[in-house]
Amino acid sequence: YVSKYDPTKIVIKADGQALGKGVVLPRSPEGARETILDFMVRKSLREAGERVLIQKRLEGQEVSVIAFMSNQIGLLVPARDYKRAYDGDAGPNTGGMGGYAPNENLSRETLYRIHDVILRRTQFAMRSEGIPYRGVLYAGIMLTDEGPKVLEFNVRRGDPEAQLQLPRLITPLLPAMEATMRETLDPDMVRSDSR
C-alpha cells in the first residue's frame, strides 16, 4: 500500500502512544517499507505500532500551543521543540531534544487564529459530542503557507515545552489548574512573560 505514494510526500505515524518516537518522514520507498515493518512486524514500538497512519507531509515551522481547556481557554506562551536527533534534524524523532519559548515564528494574528479557529472549535466539537474536556490540551501545529494545520493533539503538556513555559508563568499555576477543573477559568489566570 505505501509503495503507491512518493515517500518524500508522506509521514508514517504509529497509531498509539510512542513517547514522541512514532513519527517517521521516509526518504525512500525502502525506508517507508522498513518503517512499517519495524512498527508492525518487528514491534519496535510494541502495541503503539500495531496500526499506522499514512498522512500527507506538511511543510513549515512547528509550534507547540498548550492551553488550559475548560469553560474558557487559557494559553501558555507558545513554544518550539526540536524532536529530531543529530545535527540538521538528520536523525529519528525523540521525545524532545530541546526547544525555546516564546516562538518568534508565530505572529499574534496567527495565534488568534489558532485560538479561535482550532482550539475554540475543538472545544465546541468535544462538548457537542458529549465529551466536555477540562484539562491541558497540547496542540502540535504546523505553520504552513495555507495557514496553521493541526499535526496532533495530546491531553498533556510536552516535556521540553513544560520546562520552557512553566517558569514563564507570571500567574500562580495551582489556581489556574483548580479553576480549569471547576470550570471557572478566566483566561487572565494563565498569563506568561512573553519576552
Q: What are these language model-derived features?
A:
Residues 6, 10-12, 26-64, 118-129, ...:
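Conserved ATP-binding module of the ATP-grasp superfamily
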Residues 37-87, 132, 136-149, 188-195:
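Phosphate-binding site of ATP-dependent enzymes
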Residues 14-15, 21, 27-29, 56-57, ...:
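Fold-independent oxyanion-binding glycine-rich loops
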Residues 34, 145, 159:
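Catalytic core of tubulin tyrosine ligase-like
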Residues 1-23:
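A conserved helix-loop-beta module that forms one wall/lid of the active-site cleft
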Residues 115-137, 154-195:
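Active-site "cap" helix and flanking loop/linker of ATP-utilizing ligase/carboxylase catalytic domains
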Residues 67-69, 73-118, 154-169:
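ATP-dependent carboxylate/phosphate-activation module, predominantly the ATP-grasp catalytic core
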